[in-house]
Amino acid sequence: MRSPRGGAAAQPSGRRGDTTAAAAGDLVTTQVSLGGFDAGVAAGDLADFLEHEVGLVWRCRVKTSWTPPDSYPDFALPTAPASASAAAAPPRYDRVPPHAFVHFARPEGARRAADLAGETRLILRGKPLRVASAPDSSLRVSRRSSIAPFRFPDVRLEVGALPSPGAFLAAWRGPDAGLDLSVDPFDGCCRLVFTRDTAFTFPGFREVAAIRCDVKLEFPVRDVLEVRLYRLDCSLLLRLAAAPLVHYRTADDDFHEPVPFDLLDDDDPWIRTTDITPSGAIGRCGVYRISFSARFWPKMDRALDYMRERRVAIVDCGGGWGPRRGLTVRDELEFGEPMQDVFFCLQHAEGLKFPLLFMVNALVHKGIINQHQLTPEFFSLLGRSEENVNVAALRDFWGDKFPVFDACGRLKKALNRVARNPKLLCSKVGDDHAEVRRLVITPTRAYCLPPEVERSNRVLRHYHEVADRFLRVTFMDEGMQVLNNNVLNSFTAPIVKDLMSNFFQQKTTVYKRVRMLLTEGFHMCGRKYSFLAFSSNQLRDKSAWFFAEDRKTTVEAIRKWMGRFTSKNVAKHAARMGQCFSSTYATVTMRPDEVDESFDDVVHNEYIFSDGIGKITPDLALEVAERLQLTDNPPSAYQIRFAGFKGVIAVWQGHGDGTRLFLRPSMRKFESNHLVLEVVSWTKFQPGFLNRQIIILLSSLNVPDSIFWQMQETMLSNLNNILSDRDVAFEVLTTSCADDGNTAALMLSAGFEPRTEPHLKAMLLAIRSAQLQDLLEKARIFVPKGRWLMGCLDELGVLEQGQCFIRATVPSLNSYFVKHGSRFSSTDKNTEVILGTVVIAKNPCLHPGDVRILEAVDVPELHHLVDCLVFPQKGERPHANEASGSDLDGDLYFVTWDEKLIPPGKKSWNPMDYSPPEAKQLPRQVSQHDIIDFFLKNMISENLGRICNAHVVHADLSEYGAMDEKCIHLAELAATAVDFPKTGKLAIMPPHLKPKVYPDFMGKEDGQSYKSEKILGRLYRSIQEASNGDVVSQEVCTPNDLPYDIDLEVPGASDFLASAWQCKCSYDAQLSALLSQYRVRTEAELVTGHITFLVKNSSKKQGDIKDRLKTAYSALRKEFKSTFESIASDQCEIGDDEKNLLYEMKASAWYQVTYHPKWVEKSRGILGPDGEEIPASLSFAWIPVDYLARIKLRCHGKVRVEGQKPVERLAAYISERI
């Protein structure tokens, strides 16, 4: 019987233990691997021996091959027959010692084999056997026993594209026989597995070794977009969202498998590789045609039912039950020809410049069109219009969700749409923002991503004339998943390491591909791109900047302009260069005599208490606030970049000598002549939320679980009442949403009702949905008496050790009306000085000592520092350093003064020692080669996420929580991993700390999960139940349903209707483009920034994508707010009251063209790119929400001041002044 080669398979079990008990310590395995026997031992003989000595054997596989050291598989090369491999092999090809993978019927067999081998009592033909136990697998075995895969042997596979609905162009075919398909509900994956001879190349040798290998193509069922059935042909067409994962492992195996059922896969690792087809078909083609024997239709129908349950679209294209829609199958013209590019890319097209070529490639890479549709007619259409029109049309095209078969017809529609909406043309981006192109590179392919507007940086601002030559490249796994080190490292079975005295870690062909791209660069769209640099955040995301040189600007010239980097530690050198790529706002250009670059640091006990913080005078701080348009509420501190300095500058009075900026030596990172003060972030109201790490630590420090439960229940109750209770909705918006909820909060204050106002209702639902999702995935529980605050220093030295100062903003919307005239110009800050015991923490926080308990005191001299956590400069050690080893260069701290969250005893645990290891210095200057090696070293070793996840698991399994020895060890490893970008010291997690199973709240596959009985598990399941079947469906409002509020009509508005309609058409077109580009489901999610689901397109971190989306929408809203506020030159001198009336007329006009039935009917003529009716877009009307609030309140009459609720206070404030 042939063994299943595809991995996770079924296995019966004698008993099923309780999974929770198993997770807590009763983990077992039925697998072992053995070595030490002679090369002539057959699998059957070994199985017989083990059954006699140990116990019943269900499978035994003897293996005598492996991936030779220093070799790489090359699937494009021809091979000799496998029997000739030894003769053809280079001299360095040594065979691996024979070893075997054995499955016993019961766990006792595996344990007995390990015990006998450990006592040297398991002896075969005079040789003592060595035994290595496989990973604990009781949960997987238990789950596997009841879930069998749907297995289809000897299928035929073709990979290709659909140039039209009834035609399939094949780019590659699998072997004629021996290819198996499995659809496995066990782990939700589909696998295609076959065996082939494979050439392995060796550095310095022309000869190759031919080794027989199993090859596996694997993809999750969730990546199947559609299945088309052709019953008469006995075939399926699978359209995939992403390329499959490609694996191989050597297959010179001898099997003994007497049982008739499937088993779990052996502990013989599969090795990831790149595209195995010469033509790059796996990377560039997304359609898989699978043909099989007609006798398998009943089983196939059951497999398709399972896929249907997983929300895969199944389309029956005819057969015995209906008219046949046949499929024409033929080979593509270049069938089998080697692909010239490292990833498929259109390098040149007559008459097309780079911006257009890039967008055409983006369409092909996304699968909207395929390369066969790039016809002369298609390019001719692009040649007839201006470049900016074509780019806008292709961007509109890129927003499509489904493949397009008539590419020319769709392009014509897009060009017409742009012609009707000139605002879709790419407008000039402001100095603080830049359009950045991205390229995502996976093991088999690449994706060009359209330019996105994001915050600019020092380098892009200086080189703005060649800004389109910068490219952000991100290395990811297929399906936009994180590229973890399992993809880059070639692993062998643990028994092989035991048997080999000179074993060393190998790299995969994926690593080889990444290294080649970094060192040699690549060609794309007619340009040669070379590696430039990366920031610290990019390093963690496996991302870097590349640049396409021209005759004037080179990579070396850019590096020289950036500054003088003298550090001989590679990690620090790379981090300093990356500092220039921090996203910043350029503000004031300083004169050298205004800057003190040697302001003394505060140092005690060898600790720098002022590490990363300086001072800014009030007048300069106000100048910066003006540049950032923050004068309504000027910040107390800014996180900055200036020349070669980085850190925070807090507002303090100057010394009267003309110096306005005070920078400390601890802030200096490199030498630079750049004199623009650049701002990264600033202090502001940021609501406080718990997360899993903080909850684990507080729970371990004896904060009762009932506290977290009650806080979540309160939050859940508020979210459930958000539509029915105005007071609750207002509280949620103003206290937990920062600025994101301002529009909705103003609407509530003015008297608009969620029941009758669809845009308000949609925004509230979006916020509810996003906060529920955060509760489920992150345990992100709102803390009313909490904030995230920027760390600062008490420059006066009045705070004592153990003390801090906090003056926190209390949310208020009054400042929204400061532009409405002198009656609204009160800028008194609504703040609260916190007194008493507080808890602080900084992420990541894993050690019990990372939670610091301090005493907040009132110091009048510090009252100017708002939304800051002010630390003392006294004591044995900085409190910032005690909290996760942080400093004052911009770190944000979670702070709560809720007594229920303060651990009993009110004393901190001893903090961990965060002293960094000694930095390794090179004996020479750091080279570009060193920096690339460092980037690669991080890619194959970066495991902060794994360490943090392992900490969560062990804290959940242990009765001691975060106090468990394993957790303390993991906390130490995490500190090393966090500092890797600065020190270059790796954090290596030992095997015994790697989790075998995960608590259910971590959302792993069922076979890897157990039911957690600790607080995080209970919180998780509570939210699961609350949101089960919960339709957060953002009910899309159609034009037929749209209510019209006659209260918002004012005399004189008709004069502005025509211009309002033009603005609305332009706004809606740009809004629709944003929704399409980011695949955001609803307008309400976009405008509130509370987005429940985002398709990954360049980063594992959804937060990063959300930030870019917020930036893009903020720029759009700002543009139209500016349009609204622009008035004729002859009206500039009118008084506040007249100006406000004028704005109320315009606001009424903007409302009417959005909601009035006449204009709604007119909007019906505007269709989407595929002719579909676009849902009513309502956010345009509420850009001037402050003026619509005035109109509404005037209709209501004056609001009573006495006894008012929070939601009514703003209404009273406004009505008193109008």
UniProtKB/Swiss-Prot annotation:
Gene disruption phenotype: Lack of the shoot apical meristem (SAM) in the embryo, but formation of radicle and scutellum. In weak alleles, formation of an incomplete SAM and abnormal leaves production.
Keywords, ordered alphabetically: Nucleotidyltransferase, RNA-binding, RNA-directed RNA polymerase, RNA-mediated gene silencing, Transferase
GO BP terms in the entry: gynoecium development; leaf development; maintenance of shoot apical meristem identity; recognition of pollen; regulatory ncRNA-mediated post-transcriptional gene silencing; RNAi-mediated antiviral immune response; siRNA processing; siRNA-mediated gene silencing by inhibition of translation
InterPro entries the record matches: RNA-dep_RNA_pol_euk-typ
Catalytic activity: RNA(n) + a ribonucleoside 5'-triphosphate = RNA(n+1) + diphosphate
Domain of life: Eukaryota
Pfam families in the record: RBD_RDR6, RDR6_2nd, RdRP
Name of protein: Probable RNA-dependent RNA polymerase SHL2
Gene, per the UniProt record: SHL2
